[in-house]
Amino acid sequence: MKSLHTICLLFIFIARGNSRSCDYCHNIGKDCDGYEHECSSPEDVCGKVFLEISSASLSVRTVHKNCFSSSVCKLGHFDINIGHHSYIRGRINCCEKEPCEDQPFPGLPLSQPNGYYCPGALGLFTEDSTEYEAICKGTETKCINIVGHRHENYPGDISYNLKGCVSSCPLLSLSNSTHEENRNYLEKVECKDAFKIASH
């Protein structure tokens, strides 16, 4: 799932600077109101990212507006099976001018377990989180493990750790160590084959 490159957007709202200006805000729900800020190269288009943590009975969505690069915009979406019948999903929509059109979330996958599993975890504000077994479904035959942090002026560094099943390994690069405000930094990216569930 090449589009998983956008996982770097799960807890980022990208950088700033250049001639184009875009809305900057984040909120729980479907929309947010913020302020306009200038974009920095290579972020040359305006964008809106929707994130969703969903299970069979509950879903929580957040919206984030900022500047994005055209190449990231082409990636579109990502879906990670984090276990306990839950997914973390993202959709990115970009445009030359505001407002950007929304891209709806489809229903949760109805795929059946495929005989594989991965460590699953959703850790926010921590790089260490309790693991559990995520049962892979459908075409999910890879395990992903992503650790990073986002530096904010307030409340400071926001760490995160994501683990679960994916359909293919993303192409992600580790970030340089720095503390520029409003930037996301990937510290660990691992992707390997899922584990076969032992037959009894």
From Swiss-Prot:
Swiss-Prot/TrEMBL keywords: Disulfide bond, Glycoprotein, Phospholipase A2 inhibitor, Secreted, Signal
InterPro entries named in the record: CNF-like_PLA2_Inhibitor (IPR050918), LY6_UPA_recep-like (IPR016054), PLipase_A2-inh_b-type (IPR016338), PLipase_A2_inh_N (IPR004126), Snake_toxin-like_sf (IPR045860)
Cellular location(s): Secreted
Taxonomic source organism: Gloydius brevicaudus siniticus
Function: Inhibits the enzymatic activity of phospholipase A2 (PA2).
Transmembrane segments: none
Tissue and organ expression note: Expressed by the liver.
PANTHER family per record: LY6/PLAUR DOMAIN-CONTAINING PROTEIN 8, LY6_PLAUR DOMAIN CONTAINING 9
GO MF terms held by the record: phospholipase A2 inhibitor activity
Entry's family note: Belongs to the CNF-like-inhibitor family.
Protein name: Phospholipase A2 inhibitor gamma subunit A
Subunit comment: Occurs as a mixture of oligomers. Tetrameric arrangement appears to be the predominant quaternary structure.
Pfam (any one): PLA2_inh
Any single GO CC term annotated in Swiss-Prot or TrEMBL for this entry: extracellular region
Signal peptide range in chain numbering: 1-19
Disulphides: 22-46, 25-32, 39-67, 73-94, 95-100, 118-143, 136-165, 169-191
